Design a protein with these regions (language model features):
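C-terminal beta-sandwich/jelly-roll accessory domains of carbohydrate-active enzymes
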Residues: 304-392
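Conserved acidic residues
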Residues: 75, 172, 240
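Active-site clefts of carbohydrate-active enzymes
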Residues: 144-147, 189-223, 227, 244-258
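Substrate-binding cleft and catalytic face of glycoside hydrolase catalytic domains
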Residues: 1-169, 177-179
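Acidic/histidine-rich catalytic cores of soluble enzymes
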Residues: 174, 181-183, 209
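Aromatic- and carboxylate-lined catalytic core of secreted/periplasmic carbohydrate-active enzymes
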Residues: 217-344
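Conserved beta-strand positions
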Residues: 79, 140, 176, 202-205, ...
Length: 392
C-alpha cells in the first residue's frame, strides 16, 4: 500500500515534505481519504463510501502508524473532507461525499438518504478509533459552510444504532470551512467549553473571499479577540488555515513567479498583522467608545494596545475609559494601514484626556484601502505603545 505520495497528482514525496515542514517550524495536518475506485460503493467514484470497510481501516492504520512515529511525530489527522448531505446552495449531495443516485449532472442527482449514517459508521468512527489508538488527535473532516450549522449539530450528535456510539465522542477538534467567527460561538458553547471536544479549527478559509483585501486581517484579528475570551489555554486549541495560499489569481497570498515568488495584497496584509500584533496576546476588557463611522475591536500584544479599526475617511475618534494610570506617562499612538503597513504621519494621530477617558483622534486617508467595498472602508491598526502596566 503506497502512502508516500501527496499533492493533487500524487507526485510529491510526502515524507520529505513533512520533514521539511518540521525544519521550517511548520506543523502538518494529514487528511485521510478517499476510497479506491475498485472499492467504491458508487462504481468508480472515490468520493463514495467503501464497500469493504476493512480496506479503509488498513489504509488509515498504515498512515497513522507511520506518520505518528519518529521522525515525523504527527499528532493531528483529519478524517475525509466536507462529508455532508444536501447543501443549502442547492446541491442534493456534497461535492466530496457521494451515494446512490449521484450524477455529475446536478439536475439528475438525488439526495443521499444515508449520507450521515454511512459516514459515521463506515468512515469516521472506524478511522477515529485507529487514530486514538496511536495517541493522536482526531480532526473532523471540515464541515462545509453550505451544510448548515443545525445540520452539523445533528451529524455530530448522531448515535449509530450499529456501533452504539456518537460521532461526537470520536472528535477531538471540531472542524468547519468558511464560517465567520461569530458562527463558532454555538460550537464552542455546546462542544468545547465543557467538552468533549478539545477545540475548534477551520481547515479552509479564504479562497475567493480574499478578493476583499480586508477579509484575512479582519478574520484573524476577530478570531484572536474571540479566542482570547474562550479559555485559549493551548496553542492549537483554535486554528484557521488558508485555502489556498499560492496561485496566479491576484487575491492569493503569494504569486509563484517567475521570476520569483512574491506576496500579493492578502499576503502582505498578514505580514502587517504579524508585525503589528506579534507579541504575547491577551484580552482587553475595557469598552471602546467609537465615533460615527467607526467600528473597532482590541487586544493586547506584548506591551501594546492594538485596535483594528474599520472606518470611513476623515478625522475619526475612539475613546477608552478606565486608563487613568496612563495619564502621567508619555503616550505614543500610531495609525498603521492594515494592508500596506504604512504608518500615518505623527500629526495625523492625537491623544488627549478627559479625566480617566483617553481620546484618540486619527485621520483616515481619502484614498482608502477598501475603496471597492460597499460601502468604502479603510482598515487600519491604532496602536497605543507600552500601555500594559496601565491597563492590567
Amino acid at each position: 500500500m503506497r502512502i508516500d505520495k501527496t499533492s493533487s497528482a500524487f507526485d510529491s514525496d510526502l515524507p520529505s515534505e513533512l520533514l521539511r515542514n518540521e525544519r521550517s517550524g511548520i506543523g502538518s495536518l494529514l487528511m485521510l481519504g478517499y476510497t479506491p475506485r475498485w472499492n467504491a460503493s458508487v462504481p468508480g467514484d472515490s468520493n463514495s463510501a467503501p464497500v469493504d470497510v476493512d480496506v479503509w481501516k488498513q489504509y488509515v492504520d498504515a498512515v497513522v502508524r507511520k506518520y505518528s512515529a519518529p521522525p515525523y511525530n504527527l499528532r493531528y489527522f483529519q478524517i475525509w473532507n466536507e462529508a455532508a448531505g444536501k447543501l443549502s446552495g442547492g446541491l442534493p449531495q456534497s461535492a466530496f461525499w457521494h451515494g446512490p443516485n449521484f450524477s455529475q449532472d446536478e439536475k439528475l442527482s438525488k439526495p443521499y438518504e444515508r449520507a450521515m449514517q454511512d459516514y459515521v459508521e463506515r468512515i469516521h468512527i472506524p478511522a477515529a478509533r485507529i487514530i486514538r489508538r496511536y495517541h493522536a488527535y482526531v480532526v473532523y473532516g471540515g464541515w462545509p459552510d453550505q451544510g448548515g450549522l443545525d445540520n452539523f449539530h445533528r451529524w455530530l450528535e448522531y448515535r449509530s444504532p450499529v456501533l452504539k456510539e456518537r460521532m461526537l465522542d470520536w472528535v477531538d477538534y471540531i472542524d468547519t470551512h468558511y464560517l465567520p467567527v461569530s458562527d463558532m460561538e454555538t460550537l464552542y458553547q455546546q462542544y468545547v467549553k465543557n467538552g468533549p471536544a478539545r477545540g475548534i479549527w477551520q481547515t479552509e478559509i479564504g479562497n475567493e473571499y480574499m478578493k476583499d483585501p480586508h477579509y484575512l486581517p479582519r478574520y484573524f484579528f476577530d478570531f484572536a479577540v474571540w479566542a482570547l475570551g474562550r479559555d485559549w489555554d493551548d496553542p492549537n486549541k483554535y486554528l484557521s488555515m488558508i485555502y489556498h495560499w499560492d496561485g496566479y489569481e491576484p487575491f492569493r497570498l503569494t504569486h509563484p513567479g517567475p521570476p520569483e515568488r512574491t506576496y500579493n495584497v492578502s499576503g502582505r496584509s498578514l505580514i502587517v498583522l504579524r508585525q503589528t500584533a506579534g507579541g504575547h496576546l491577551a484580552s482587553f476588557s475595557k469598552p471602546l467608545q467609537c465615533g460615527p463611522g467607526v467600528a473597532a475591536s482590541a487586544l493586547l500584544s506584548g506591551n501594546d494596545l492594538v485596535m483594528q479599526v474599520s472606518s470611513s475617511a476623515g478625522w475619526q475618534n475612539i475613546a477608552i475609559g478606565g486608563l487613568q494610570a496612563l495619564r502621567s506617562r508619555p503616550i505614543q499612538a500610531d495609525f498603521i494601514d492594515a494592508v500596506s503597513g504604512e504608518a500615518s504621519p505623527a500629526g495625523n494621530v492625537a491623544v488627549s484626556w478627559d479625566n480617566d477617558l483617553m481620546n484618540l483622534r486619527f485621520k483616515v486617508p481619502e484614498h482608502m484601502n477598501g475603496a471597492d467595498n460597499n460601502p468604502p472602508r479603510h482598515l487600519a491598526y491604532l496602536v497605543v505603545r507600552r500601555v500594559t502596566q496601565g491597563v492590567t
